[in-house]
């Protein structure tokens, strides 16, 4: 551990007479310390302002910002992406997602109710990561104040407009929960991939020769 060296400041002499007190006051008031403080104040006064006058002004948010959720639709058709698998409900650490489904005539799940309790949600984004259909994503709407509790968490609050999906006025989501454009290049092989490659090589080596090759050997 480095040795710390302390510098002892000279002890200030005590002032007794009125004349000495007056001189000390003038020296302290008009000394360099006063001008140093004023210099810093003047420097910050003329520096560019960094204050944002919210809500009239807002800073641009990152595409991967995690705020109120969006339920996506398929482009062109406008159909809902959600297939009712319930993975988002299972992985939710806050236990704030509720999905009620039933089996339709085509033996596929139909969604009766999809709610998110925004009062409990911690906006971790796990639901967006686990969704196989990219149906639920994290949006950038953080202004969700309301006077009525019933306005929090309804499906109509999160679902993308069907008209916007059919007109392709909104692009595929590129924020938190979306697939990266270069995910193939960034994907790394897992230990299971190496095991599969070894099993394929072993199966090729153990493949028996065809009967025709044995006949050819006998003729020779």
Swiss-Prot record:
Transmembrane segments: none annotated. It is a peripheral membrane protein. Its EC number is 7.1.1.-. Residues 198-220 have a biased composition (Basic and acidic residues). Its main location: membrane. [4Fe-4S] cluster 1 binds at residues 82, 85, 88, 131. GO terms for biological process: aerobic respiration. It catalyses: a quinone + NADH + 5 H(+)(in) = a quinol + NAD(+) + 4 H(+)(out). InterPro entries: 4Fe4S_Fe-S-bd, 4Fe4S_Fe_S_CS, NADH_quinone_OxRdtase_chainI. Residues 71-102, 112-141 form the 4Fe-4S ferredoxin-type domain. [4Fe-4S] cluster 2 binds at residues 92, 121, 124, 127. Residues 190-220 are annotated as: Disordered. Its cofactor is [4Fe-4S] cluster. Binds 2 [4Fe-4S] clusters per subunit. GO terms for molecular function: 4 iron, 4 sulfur cluster binding; iron ion binding; NADH:ubiquinone reductase (non-electrogenic) activity; quinone binding. It is an enzyme of class 7 (translocase). One of its GO terms (cellular component) is plasma membrane. It is found in: Cell inner membrane. Keywords: 4Fe-4S, Cell inner membrane, Cell membrane, Iron, Iron-sulfur, Membrane, Metal-binding, NAD, Quinone, Repeat, Translocase, Ubiquinone. PANTHER family: NADH DEHYDROGENASE [UBIQUINONE] IRON-SULFUR PROTEIN 8, MITOCHONDRIAL (PTHR10849:SF20), NADH DEHYDROGENASE UBIQUINONE IRON-SULFUR PROTEIN 8, MITOCHONDRIAL (PTHR10849). Belongs to the complex I 23 kDa subunit family. NDH-1 shuttles electrons from NADH, via FMN and iron-sulfur (Fe-S) centers, to quinones in the respiratory chain. The immediate electron acceptor for the enzyme in this species is believed to be ubiquinone. Couples the redox reaction to proton translocation (for every two electrons transferred, four hydrogen ions are translocated across the cytoplasmic membrane), and thus conserves the redox energy in a proton gradient. NDH-1 is composed of 14 different subunits. Subunits NuoA, H, J, K, L, M, N constitute the membrane sector of the complex. HAMAP family: NDH1_NuoI (MF_01351). This is NADH-quinone oxidoreductase subunit I. The lineage of its organism: Bacteria, Pseudomonadati, Campylobacterota, Epsilonproteobacteria, Campylobacterales.
């Amino acid at each position: 551990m480095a040795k710390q060296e302390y510098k002892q400041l000279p002890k200030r002499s005590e002032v007794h007479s009125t004349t000495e007190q007056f001189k000390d006051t003038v020296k302290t008031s008009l000394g360099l310390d006063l001008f140093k403080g004023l210099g810093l104040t003047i420097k910050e006064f003329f520096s560019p302002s960094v204050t944002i006058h919210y809500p009239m002004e807002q800073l641009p948010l990152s595409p991967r910002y995690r705020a109120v959720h969006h339920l996506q639709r398929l482009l062109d058709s406008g159909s809902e992406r959600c297939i009712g698998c319930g993975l988002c409900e299972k992985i939710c650490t806050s236990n704030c997602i509720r999905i009620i489904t039933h089996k339709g005539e085509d033996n596929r799940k139909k969604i009766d109710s999809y709610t998110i309790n925004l009062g409990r949600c911690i906006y971790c984004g796990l639901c967006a990561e686990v969704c196989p259909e990219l149906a639920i994503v994290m949006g950038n709407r953080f202004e969700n104040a309301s006077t009525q509790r019933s306005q929090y968490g309804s499906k109509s609050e999160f679902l993308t407009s069907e008209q916007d999906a059919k007109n392709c006025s909104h692009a595929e989501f590129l924020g938190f929960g979306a697939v990266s454009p270069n995910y193939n290049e960034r994907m790394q092989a897992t230990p299971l991939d190496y095991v599969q490659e070894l099993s394929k090589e072993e199966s090729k080596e153990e493949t028996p020769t065809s009967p025709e090759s044995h006949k050819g050997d006998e003729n020779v």
